[in-house]
Amino acid sequence: MKLTNYTDYSLRVLIFLAAERPGELSNIKQIAETYSISKNHLMKVIYRLGQLGYVETIRGRGGGIRLGMDPEDINIGEVVRKTEDDFNIVECFDANKNLCVISPVCGLKHVLNEALLAYLAVLDKYTLRDLVKNKEDIMKLLKMKE
């Protein structure tokens, strides 16, 4: 399964913020430049992450963004479910768009659904804290100050 850029960017933002010193504010420009991501795309991602409570945004001079909750409380499977807009990995997953003639008797849909559930179950085992256990290495690659 391929994640959308939106979900990929969401996870990257969370990793970036988790690698920062606790309470430290970051900004969209800094994250966009670090990952070579469009600021416009990133603003949409951060807005949604804020709505979900994963990030806290502080407006005004001296403002920025930081994690809105402890990395231990941010479940990766949950983030993926809330940021992916389509888990219909084949046509027959969507009853409104399914034109496949063998769909009523085909076993593929059930196998793929089982695989999708297993994929999400693995992601459910991990938190953001698990993804930044090597925080010092991440900080070096992101060129952050320790």
Swiss-Prot record:
Record key words, sorted: 2Fe-2S, Activator, DNA-binding, Iron, Iron-sulfur, Metal-binding, Repressor, Transcription, Transcription regulation
GO molecular function annotations of the record: 2 iron, 2 sulfur cluster binding; DNA binding; DNA-binding transcription factor activity; metal ion binding
InterPro entries the UniProt entry points to: TR_Rrf2-type_CS, Tscrpt_reg_Rrf2, WH-like_DNA-bd_sf, WH_DNA-bd_sf
HTH rrf2-type domain location: 2-133
Chain residues that bind [2Fe-2S] cluster: C92, C100, C106
Cofactor note: Binds 1 [2Fe-2S] cluster per subunit.
PROSITE patterns, per the entry: HTH_RRF2_1, HTH_RRF2_2
Any one GO biological process: regulation of DNA-templated transcription
DNA-binding region boundaries: 28-51
A Gene Ontology cellular-component term: cytosol
Cofactor(s) of this protein: [2Fe-2S] cluster
Keyword Lyase: no
Role according to the record: Nitric oxide-responsive transcriptional regulator. It represses the expression of flavohemoprotein hmp and the nitrite reductase nasD. Probably plays a role in the up-regulation of the resDE regulon in the presence of nitric oxide.
Protein's recorded name: HTH-type transcriptional regulator NsrR
